[in-house]
Amino acid sequence: QASIVSSVAKIVASGADYKKVYLTLQEFFEKLRNEPARWGKPFQALLGALEAQLGLNAAAIGGKDSMSGTFLDKDVPPTLISFAIAPVKAEEVISNEFKAAGHPVYMFGSCAVNDYEALKAAWETYHALCQAGKVASAWAVDGGGIAEGVMKMSFGNGVGFRSNPDAGLQYGAAYGQIIAELTEEIEGAELIGWTTADGNITYGSETVSIAELYALNTAVLEKVYPTKTKETDKAIPAFSSAFDTHVAPAVKVAKPKVLIPVFPGTNCEYDSARAVMAAGGEADIVVIRNLTAEDVSRSVETVASKIAESQMIFIPGGFSGGDEPDG
């Protein structure tokens, strides 16, 4: 449930309409063997995902599952990842960093992850504000709660935050809720604070600088994914190249035409076309349509005529759908 709700909330926070969202799921589980407890983990996860999809009217249109995440005595942690997609105009996309001081910050959503009607109502209110141009920034609350969201929204531009003393800020998970920096005050949402220009985050009587929080946050994985290299006193060698320009006659070179047929399940046709063009050829991508018998017949005729015009046929690989043309 939390995975579905979280993914939808993230794309809603970005400015999309939840009613236009589709999902795809990625699952990783240990080898099930003949053990009921192992079978129960993916079964429970998928039942929860289905309940959330029905509650939010969001269909999963594809996905990938793996039930072989075991090597010797090591098991992968039970995992279900939800990806949400929806169309939205580029100019209407909302980013998550606080934009300016003096703006009110509101919370939209329900504390209960499975209160789908309350979530949808809150998301509709929020989306209407997005359409009206009143949302400056937004963050979909995840496992770190509201406190994490406010902290990371402050990192982008160094804009501070002061909490509303009447608001109950959460440090625990609050999947589905959206923190939004608005350009004006409104009714119908919880006011949790205001953006500030002092470079600090203030909760009640506690104040911490954004710089200190950022340093602590980035230091967690610095040893795993270092962002800085070791300093060295060695002089950096200087490289130079001297060459003479000369005029060469224009020589026309024939470019072989390469036919790249795209079957159901084929992928990497664009990579193949780039490789052909980099080698001096002319790529011609032709999609083999098979929705109807007439489509197949026309595709055969098209490919036949294209073959007659080409010097090469390049068949790209495929590992999805029907694994064509070798499936």
Model regions and ranges:
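Residue-level signal for inorganic ion chemistry
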Residues: G15, G102, A180
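Flexible gly/pro-rich beta->alpha loop and the following alpha-helix that scaffold active-site loops
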Residues: A275-A278, E282-G327
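Short glycine-/acidic-enriched loop or helix-start segments at secondary-structure transitions
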Residues: L72, Y270, E324-D326
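Structural motif
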Residues: Y106, I179-E181, F314-P316
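A glycine-rich phosphate/pyrophosphate-binding beta-strand-loop-alpha-helix module
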Residues: A2-G69
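Intein/HINT protein-splicing elements and their conserved insertion hotspots or analogous self-processing inserts
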Residues: Q1, A37, P42-Q44, A59-A174, ...
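Glycine-rich phosphate/diphosphate-binding loop of Rossmann-like nucleotide-binding domains
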Residues: K255, L259-G280, I285
